[in-house]
């Protein structure tokens, strides 16, 4: 069958010759492309797995223009046929939108609340539904209208259609009566004849299964079967799950470790639990809730990495960790726009593990910079995709080597791991909350609410979700980067040189970090023979190494600015004026970061009082050229000797040693106590070291030695042996220690407290300036919080207004489509009037026939009346009786033809019936 458009052929059309130069191409009588019904089946074959087809139907409910909160997947039996049902409480569709959804290639999805739609090609519902079964019915309501649409291969085969036909019937949601359009009547007839519902009442009852005033329900039957005749999906094995039929959980040996195929390959419940990177809706599978999870937050021994694609300037975060549920499953989970595309993709050492390399390691990445394939089961094989896979392989290998090199690490533990962080979704507001501490997710209730949260800040559903610190660090705004670049240019390059050291000891606890906001940075301090026991024990404990975090470097910038306000020459002058204790050169000269620790004698300052004063910063102890040969043998850790409150904390360098020793200032990063969480304890510390110009030019060597436990013990042993060989170098400390602990503490407390008036005045001005700065900072923080609250308020108002605008625009479009001015509505009215006219003509013809019969009866009666006119009374009575019966029959006839005619109180002996009959005949122009 050929379809044409427009008028006869003209120039530029087939058979009409070639178009002239400069002429406009014509579309008249050009053949239209038609779509064969067989395309429905061939299009569905793009999904190699049935779960991929189910994911397409779920994606339609997740899209931002639908915003469904709950999706129900169930199996129902209708007329002894198993049917798959998908029901959501989204926004629903108008008949016009339903027609576009059942057509091919139409997609008008929008971005809402920074959430991107998953669909791209406008083909997901057709391919997904036809992959699961041959026939599908769609029921949708949007608050004003109800609509039913049929997409059926069986229907197209029965009518031998040459193109894809989709019957759609609209109903009024108020009275559930059909809205008459030009195709509503034949569409309803087709649905009732070729679907599993044969009456309109059963069809409309399906709308009652949709919760609320809006939503959509999809019903699929004639489930696809395998070659052996069995259904592709197994509904009987597990009453709360849908499994793939005849699926064997195959096992194979990989590097001596038994590896099972993931549960997501054959269990729909497991597949739905990880289908979305951050789920935003509840899924009920066969009347039981699916425990959705953020797989990136359900791993143990988590490490983060970044990857910068070549096609975009944004950095992409990669998460690596060990699976807590299945120790023998591994691979990279690759998402796109929050949707899982490739699951358990093997990379790096996981491709061909010989000794179990990479087994148990799960990687998570969101590849929004890649383009998914047509069926959303893979990515297009481009250069960017190959570079991404290679980068994942390198980073996964590095993660595996780092974890294996750690002590007491078990790749395959005997007991179940607990995630580093436990996140749970509120059943009411659907927000994700992080629980403090390490909590086993299996111990949480099936329905969890915000008021269960032990954290007092997140006990209400109105509180926004907790922002992830690592996301803020990896995706910093350009404004912050520009500010940082400007600050770097403003620094005096001739005064200090900076070096960045990674892998320092762990950051201080939360309360210490919070106190750093109200403290200044002290000057450098050098070890002396007077050591307090608590400080010595603190300095001997080997610190742990942590990974690098850029956030620590950002927040430490404000302390660097405070130090930058005081010139270097002024600090030198203050240092030379301060009395110093002799320095023990026999001790180790390697650089070490020392945590600020102070012993408080009885009756003196307590830790609470000290929190308002200056705190001792971490230190880096330099190495001298003269003692370089001794450091190979002597590595005993130095310690600090704290002074009193009035004295500047720590000892300063003498003037004669200043040209030989580098001046080091370590800056400790801090965060606000509101924003610091458990991740900050795991985060790294970045030390920014300033080296005086004179010392840097002298060529004094700088060495950083990591503190491993075994190496540290060996250094102590070598130091003790060197001291025994050189007794004179340690005579002073030994003599000091012989006086006893009381003498040592007394000397530590009675350090000289000489301060010049100039220094005291400078210190006072600095303290006042710092107090003003802190007060301004607190004021600015309060204003920022108020502005943030106001911004959130107006943001919510804006979103509400935007939602109302979308609603009004949708209603306006629907009103235009179904208004009385629309041609479709006028056509519907014309069809109704035309049908009434046909019925009236038929009734008129029937009345004419009945009137002819009545006239013939009257003629017979008249003849009988004339023939029986005789004086005999019996004949007259019989004639009157017959006339009465005839009048009764005529009255019955009139009553059947005209139901509104009342003839109950009329006497049949009179001529009233004759008069009424004559009036009816005259009114219908029959006598003419």
UniProtKB/Swiss-Prot annotation:
Residues 485-497, 626-636, 739-748, 756-766 have a biased composition (Basic and acidic residues). A zinc finger (CW-type) spans 417-469. It is found in: Nucleus. InterPro entries: HATPase_C_sf (IPR036890), MORC_ATPase (IPR045261), Morc_S5 (IPR041006), Znf_CW (IPR011124). Residues 758-867 form a coiled coil. PROSITE patterns: ZF_CW. Keywords: Coiled coil, Metal-binding, Nucleus, Zinc, Zinc-finger. Residues 474-510, 527-546, 599-649, 718-766 are annotated as: Disordered. One of its GO terms (cellular component) is nucleoplasm. The keyword Signal does not apply. Zn(2+) binds at residues 426, 429, 450, 461. GO terms for molecular function: ATP hydrolysis activity; methylated histone binding; zinc ion binding. The CW-TYPE zinc finger mediates its binding to trimethylated histone H3K4me3. Histone methylation reader which binds to non-methylated (H3K4me0), monomethylated (H3K4me1), dimethylated (H3K4me2) and trimethylated (H3K4me3) 'Lys-4' on histone H3. The order of binding preference is H3K4me3 > H3K4me2 > H3K4me1 > H3K4me0. This is MORC family CW-type zinc finger protein 4. The lineage of its organism: Eukaryota, Metazoa, Chordata, Craniata, Vertebrata.
């Amino acid at each position: 069958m050929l379809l044409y458009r427009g008028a006869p052929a003209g120039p530029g059309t087939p058979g009409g010759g070639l178009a002239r130069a400069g002429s406009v191409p014509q579309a008249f009588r050009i053949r239209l492309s038609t779509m064969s019904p067989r395309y429905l089946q061939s299009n569905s074959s793009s999904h190699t797995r049935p779960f991929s087809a189910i994911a397409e139907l779920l994606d339609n409910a997740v899209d931002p223009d639908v915003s469904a909160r709950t999706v129900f997947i169930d199996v129902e039996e209708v007329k002894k046929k198993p049917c798959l049902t998908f029901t959501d409480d989204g926004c629903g569709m108008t008949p016009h939108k339903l027609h576009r959804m059942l057509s091919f290639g139409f997609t008008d999805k929008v971005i809402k609340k920074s959430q991107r739609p998953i669909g791209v090609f406008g083909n997901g519902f057709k391919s997904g539904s036809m992959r699961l079964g041959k026939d599908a019915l769609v029921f949708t309501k949007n608050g004003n209208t109800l609509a039913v649409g049929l997409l059926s291969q069986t229907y197209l085969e029965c009518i031998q259609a040459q193109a894809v036909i989709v019957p759609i019937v609209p109903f009024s949601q108020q009275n559930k009566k059909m809205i008459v359009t030009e195709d509503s009547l034949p569409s309803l007839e087709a649905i009732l004849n070729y679907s599993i519902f044969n009456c309109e009442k059963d069809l409309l009852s399906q709308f009652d299964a949709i919760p609320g005033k809006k939503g959509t329900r999809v019903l699929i039957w004639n489930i696809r079967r395998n070659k052996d005749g069995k259904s592709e999906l197994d509904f009987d094995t597990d009453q709360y799950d849908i499994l793939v039929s005849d699926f064997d959980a195959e096992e194979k040996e990989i590097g001596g470790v038994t590896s099972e195929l993931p549960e997501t390959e054959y269990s729909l419940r497991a597949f739905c639990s990880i289908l979305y990177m951050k789920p935003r809706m509840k899924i009920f599978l066969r009347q039981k809730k699916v425990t959705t999870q953020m797989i990136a937050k359900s791993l143990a021994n988590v490490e983060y990495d970044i990857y910068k694609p070549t096609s975009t300037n944004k950095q992409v975060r990669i998460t690596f960790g060990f699976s807590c549920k299945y120790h023998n499953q591994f691979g990279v989970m690759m998402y796109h726009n929050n949707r899982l595309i490739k699951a358990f993709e093997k990379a790096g050492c996981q491709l061909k593990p010989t000794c179990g390399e990479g087994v148990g390691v799960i990687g998570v990445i969101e590849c929004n910079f890649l383009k998914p394939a047509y069926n959303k089961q893979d990515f297009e094989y481009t250069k960017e995709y190959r570079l991404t896979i290679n980068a994942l392989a390198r980073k996964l290998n590095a993660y595996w080597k780092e974890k294996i090199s750690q002590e007491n690490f078990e790749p395959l533990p005997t007991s179940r791991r607990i995630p580093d962080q436990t996140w749970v979704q509120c059943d009411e507001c659907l927000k994700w909350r992080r629980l403090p501490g390490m909590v086993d997710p299996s111990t949480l209730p099936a329905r969890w609410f915000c008021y269960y949260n032990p954290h007092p800040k997140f006990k209400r559903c109105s509180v926004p979700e907790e922002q992830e610190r690592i996301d803020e660090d990896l995706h910093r705004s350009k404004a912050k980067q520009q500010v940082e670049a400007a600050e770097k240019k403003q620094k005096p390059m001739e005064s200090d040189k900076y070096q960045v050291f990674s892998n320092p000891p762990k950051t201080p606890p939360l309360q210490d970090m919070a106190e750093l906001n109200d403290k200044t940075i002290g000057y450098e301090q050098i070890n002396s023979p007077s050591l307090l026991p608590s400080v010595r024990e603190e300095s001997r404990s080997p610190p742990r190494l942590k990974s690098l975090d850029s956030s620590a470097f950002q927040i430490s910038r404000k302390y660097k600015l405070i130090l930058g306000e005081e010139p270097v020459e002024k600090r030198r002058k203050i240092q030379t004026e301060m009395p110093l204790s002799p320095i023990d050169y026999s001790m180790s000269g390697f650089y070490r970061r020392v945590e600020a620790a102070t012993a408080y004698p009885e009756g003196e300052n307590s830790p609470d009082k000290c929190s308002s004063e200056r705190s001792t910063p971490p230190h880096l102890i330099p190495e001298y050229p003269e003692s370089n040969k001794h450091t190979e043998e002597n590595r005993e850790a130095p310690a600090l000797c704290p002074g009193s409150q009035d004295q500047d904390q720590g000892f300063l360098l003498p003037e004669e040693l200043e040209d030989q020793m580098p001046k080091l200032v370590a800056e400790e990063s801090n965060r606000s106590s509101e924003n610091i969480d458990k991740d900050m304890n795991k985060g790294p510390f970045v030390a920014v070291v300033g080296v005086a110009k004179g010392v840097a030019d002298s060529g004094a060597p700088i060495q950083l030695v990591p503190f491993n436990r075994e190496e540290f013990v060996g250094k102590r042993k070598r130091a003790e042996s060197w001291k025994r060989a050189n007794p004179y170098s340690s005579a002073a400390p030994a003599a000091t220690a012989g006086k006893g602990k009381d003498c040592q503490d007394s000397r530590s407390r009675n350090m000289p407290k000489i301060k010049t008036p100039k220094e005291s005045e400078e210190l006072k001005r600095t303290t006042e300036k710092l107090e003003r700065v802190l007060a301004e900072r607190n004021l600015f923080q309060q204003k920022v919080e108020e502005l943030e609250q106001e911004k959130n308020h107006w943001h919510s108002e804006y979103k509400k207004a935007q939602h109302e605008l979308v609603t009004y625009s949708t209603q306006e479009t629907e009103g235009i489509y179904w208004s009385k001015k629309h041609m479709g509505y006028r056509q519907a009215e014309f069809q109704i009037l035309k049908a009434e006219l046909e019925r009236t003509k038929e009734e008129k013809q029937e009345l004419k026939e009945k009137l002819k019969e009545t006239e013939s009866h009257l003629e017979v009666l008249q003849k009988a009346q004339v023939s029986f006119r005789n004086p005999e009374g019996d004949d007259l009575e019989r004639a009157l009786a017959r006339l009465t019966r005839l009048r009764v029959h005529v009255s019955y006839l009139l009553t059947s033809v005209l139901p509104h005619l009342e003839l109950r109180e009329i006497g049949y002996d009179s001529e009233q019936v004759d008069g009424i009959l004559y009036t009816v005949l005259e009114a219908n122009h029959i006598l003419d």
